[in-house]
């Protein structure tokens, strides 16, 4: 496996890793190497989904409005969709990272602006039934698919308000955010520390805003960081991981 053969850049984590903390982990592009929702749309949706995507990119639609219009365009039957999800890999080191968290009693929650059905299918296929999932709810009916937003909040453009979820999940502890994209940027403001996938929008946002963060290539990097001695006092390292 590539992750176990690559020389790791070990970076220090802040002091709170020895205290009570909770891990909030994104899914699409974080737990998986690519955005699963976009891959499903690309493969199975009417081509007009791209026009809706462009409207979102231009700022004319919120992320929630965008997904609400795109998901009904998916034409795959449930069995075909399941077969597609069976082929979706997880990012190198994620399975090992979940085992590490479980062995240390570290609360790990998947909080995603994607589809709960796809997330659970992929996690369950890898034997990870125990991980809590907070995501938009995919509804299947005779007429097709639609999305519900049980974790949305008025005034939040996302389907899942990650800030609201984190305030509950990590109410009595520090919040460690692991993510990659735009849906993670708001939570990065209040998270105690952020692990941002190298070269993605979350990394750029944290750097521009001066939020405490470090980059990673895969979950083997994160595992190495957790196992490394915590420096005293903590200081943000200047080193950046190599480009992908």
Locations of regions flagged by a protein language model:
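Alpha-helical substrate-recognition element adjacent to the catalytic core
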Residues: 2-137
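A general, composition-driven signal for non-globular sequence regions
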Residues: 1-2, 156
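C-terminal cap/substrate-recognition subdomain and adjoining C-terminal extension
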Residues: 93-107, 114-244
């Amino acid at each position: 496996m590539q992750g176990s053969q690559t020389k790791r850049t070990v970076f220090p984590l802040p002091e709170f890793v020895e205290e009570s903390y909770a891990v909030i982990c994104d899914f699409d592009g974080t737990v998986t190497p690519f955005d699963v929702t976009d891959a499903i749309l690309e493969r199975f949706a009417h081509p007009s989904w791209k026009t809706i995507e462009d409207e979102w990119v231009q700022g004319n639609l919120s992320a929630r409005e965008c997904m609400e219009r795109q998901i009904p365009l998916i034409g795959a039957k449930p069995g075909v969709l399941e077969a597609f999800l069976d082929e979706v890999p997880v990012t190198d080191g994620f399975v090992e990272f979940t085992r590490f968290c479980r062995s240390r009693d570290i609360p790990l929650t998947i909080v995603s602006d994607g589809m709960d059905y796809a997330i659970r299918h992929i996690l369950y296929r890898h034997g990870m039934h125990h991980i809590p999932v907070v995501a938009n709810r995919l509804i299947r009916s005779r007429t097709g698919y639609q999305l519900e937003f049980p974790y949305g909040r008025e005034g939040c453009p996302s389907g899942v308000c990650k800030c609201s979820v984190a305030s509950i999940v990590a109410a009595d502890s520090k919040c460690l955010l692991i993510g990659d994209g735009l849906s993670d940027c708001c939570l990065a403001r209040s998270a105690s520390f952020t692990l941002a996938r190298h070269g993605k929008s979350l990394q750029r946002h944290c750097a521009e805003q001066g939020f405490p963060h470090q980059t990673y290539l895969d979950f083997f990097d994160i595992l190495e960081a957790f196992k490394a001695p915590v420096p005293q006092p903590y200081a943000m390292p200047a080193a950046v991981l190599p480009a992908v």
